[in-house]
Amino acid sequence: MSVMNEPTVDFHLKLNEQQFHIPNELLKRNLKQCQKLIDKEATALEKSFEELDRLVRNPQNDESSMALLNEIIQKVERLERKLTKRVNVELQLLQRIDARIKYYQQLDQIKQSGDRNRLLEWYQSYTNLLISDYLTRNSMYEGEDDISCSSTPPPARLKRKLSSASSQLTTATSNNDPDRSHVNPGVEYLKQQGLDLLLDYDILLTTNRISKQLTINHELGPLLDWIKENATYLKHTSSMLEFEARFQEYIEYVKVEDYSKAITCFQTHLVKFLYSNPLDLQQAAGLLVFIKACKSNISSYVPTPRHEEIVKQQTLLQSKEDFWSFFFLKLPKSSKKDHKTNIEVKNNELAASVDIKRYMELLDDRRWEKLNEMFLKAYYSMYGISYHDPLLIYLSLGISSLKTKDCLHERRAFVSPNNELSEFLSSEVLRNACPVCSPEFAPIAQKLPYAHQVQSRLFENPVMLPSGNVYDAEKLKALAQTLRKRKLVVMGEDEVLDPIAGHTYALTDFITMYPT
């Protein structure tokens, strides 16, 4: 690496702007929460002092005055503890910002000194930071194994706050507890390297928890809590995350045939989206009618055991009169108790005449992946974090500068009854040392553009064999000599082996190539 050609410190600061943007946003949130807390408690204390002032004017109210005074003192002490907690959060955030400023000041000093070794050490630490970021985002979070074994139904709510500054810092601090059986490897690696102040891993842990709950456990509780806490931001950005989350909650209730809760969810949370998502609501209502027909068309569907309570609720919605009573709190005008309609039979007849494929799509588990992507985009956008992993972005940039049109084309040796020969050709002759073609980087390189190479490297003596394959003549002769020496192939001194086609050719079969 040339120190002279290395990017400037300003370039690195712009590239890693989120390292300062995130704590700045958390500081703003913490300040707003402090202000709300002070305003709320100040109003309550003001009323208490007014009441105390009224009581002390009458000597007969001395006991009441003392009781109220003690209550005021307790309120002030509680306020002091809460404010102390907020101040500690602010100090931690300021400590992060200070550490990051010093980190890039160190880079500036290294560049000015021109010390190559120290520069490489700085880049090694930066690489460790990228690795920690990737592991924190994508690893299993603490206690996930326990949660995945829970018998709680998918729509259940987990009452916890996950994105306030104080709760995130508290959650991150709890990772130091040695009694915890599951620790995020990204956070562990970050602390081992002494870089924990350079990455807002508490923010990443929060999104990791919610994301894994969605994709692995199909649990909506943490996401719904986060949506409620950040409703103002989601409304400001016109995000449809709340609708999709509530829609999925409705679908989960319908799946387990808890129609009463499904209808309540529809009335409480989905009706307000009537004007923005009318077609989706129409489809949601249709799912309630065709759910049994959809299940009968899904061969892999395993029915969920219903609780006694759900079975009891089911019996309440068996007729037209029952639906009218539930929705409109009255019976239809044409209702006659002596003439009940068999709704199940009519539903089967209706399902036969309706394309239920669009309703079956609502039961697809891929909806959880879609919901997870929508959440990640909203979450990362709120904090100004890159949606894509920074480590993969850097790798993609490096790989695309090496990728040529010859990459990712697998070369297989011919199948030979001589296993020793096949092994030698595969491991020694046709082995591709190109990093772009390696199993680790090939998936990343698939969709990347080719590099604009301005130089070409040609064989010194290119020849084409009758098979159409082109090789370096001297390397073919050296390979033939090695094969004869190892007694892997029986051939004459004037013959060579095509390692791809597996045919033996004489030297006189060479066709000299002239690149133009």
Swiss-Prot record:
Per the database record, which ranges form the CTLH domain?
Answer: 203-261
For this protein, the record's InterPro entries field holds:
CTLH/CRA (IPR024964), CTLH_C (IPR006595), Fyv10_fam (IPR045098), ZF_RING_GID (IPR044063)
**Which cysteines does the record link by disulfide bonds?**
none
The GO terms this record gives for MF are: ubiquitin protein ligase activity; zinc ion binding
State whether keyword Nucleus applies.
Answer: yes
Signal peptide interval: none
Q: Pfam family example for this protein?
A: CTLH
The biased composition feature labelled Low complexity covers: 163-174
Tell me which PROSITE patterns the record gives: CTLH, ZF_RING_GID
Q: Which domain of life is it from?
A: Eukaryota
UniProt keywords, alphabetically: Cytoplasm, Metal-binding, Nucleus, Zinc, Zinc-finger
Record PANTHER family: E3 UBIQUITIN-PROTEIN TRANSFERASE MAEA, MACROPHAGE ERYTHROBLAST ATTACHER-RELATED
Similarity remark: Belongs to the FYV10 family.
Which protein, by its recorded name, is this? Protein FYV10
Gene of origin? FYV10
